[in-house]
């Protein structure tokens, strides 16, 4: 790769090359679109990779029924604006059971509405490759995951049964029923993502920017009161605080951080001084009985 490219242009070129290779190599790929900052970068890269043509695979959102309202609105706006094929899947069994992170807990909610829902959708549509926005700097189990992450016929990830990746050579051979999770952003950092969003003018949900929002402090985490379904427990007060989100997911399981960063340059400045992981606000990551590695072995993203 040219030494004259900036590090962001090198990362961009690497990601685009991975996307083009998957589109050429697999029969039925899909991009998992979770509506966050990494998904927004993936969408931007996919549009660049196949411009001026249409993105040659659909985008799929596994909707848990508990996403921030703004995320759903943003998702639909992006689909209408850019004209990509959007698949939205909700686990019908979970909906029928009335699964809620408040009444059933974070582990059961994640297992049924996210993991089981994702596996249902992949099987239903017969996808043999699925793009995801995970990065190696996010979390320790993701740090050892390959760009082409092999999954067996049950969508399980076995960290001891992965393929060597030499330079930019990837092995995409799968038998019927098996699949590959593909992570084009593996070598990006959170700071890279924000700098790229700023330089490329990529649209993101405004939840990433600091604003006054209604929150409740629960177990040391600031949870935003996004709708009327959130129960306020005895002794809790809804407070209006200047907060933003470093990561987005189900609103009852995603903690806000107090911040004054209302613009992208201010977020980047904040990232340069930050010493904590962006996933510190994810309640599911604090559930020792359901670690990320265990979830991935069961078929999680």
From Swiss-Prot:
Pathway where this protein functions = Sulfur metabolism; hydrogen sulfide biosynthesis; sulfite from sulfate: step 1/3
User: What protein family is recorded?
Assistant: Belongs to the PAPS reductase family. CysD subfamily.
Superkingdom of origin: Bacteria
Gene Ontology terms: biological process: hydrogen sulfide biosynthetic process; sulfate assimilation
Concerning InterPro entries, the annotation shows:
PAPS_reduct_dom (IPR002500), Rossmann-like_a/b/a_fold (IPR014729), SO4_adenylTrfase_ssu (IPR011784), Sulfate_adenylyltrnsfr_sub2 (IPR050128)
The organism's taxonomy opens as:
Bacteria, Pseudomonadati, Pseudomonadota, Gammaproteobacteria, Alteromonadales
Functionally, this protein is described as follows:
With CysN forms the ATP sulfurylase (ATPS) that catalyzes the adenylation of sulfate producing adenosine 5'-phosphosulfate (APS) and diphosphate, the first enzymatic step in sulfur assimilation pathway. APS synthesis involves the formation of a high-energy phosphoric-sulfuric acid anhydride bond driven by GTP hydrolysis by CysN coupled to ATP hydrolysis by CysD.
Q: Which residues cross the membrane?
A: none
**What gene is this protein translated from?**
cysD1
State which Enzyme Commission number(s) the record gives. 2.7.7.4
What is known about its subunit structure? Heterodimer composed of CysD, the smaller subunit, and CysN.
Spell out the protein name for this chain: Sulfate adenylyltransferase subunit 2 1
What HAMAP family does UniProt report for this protein, alphabetically? Sulf_adenylyltr_sub2
What organism does the record attribute this protein to? Shewanella sediminis (strain HAW-EB3)
Q: Which cysteines are joined by disulfide bonds?
A: none
User: What Pfam families does the record point to?
Assistant: PAPS_reduct
- Which top EC class is given? transferase
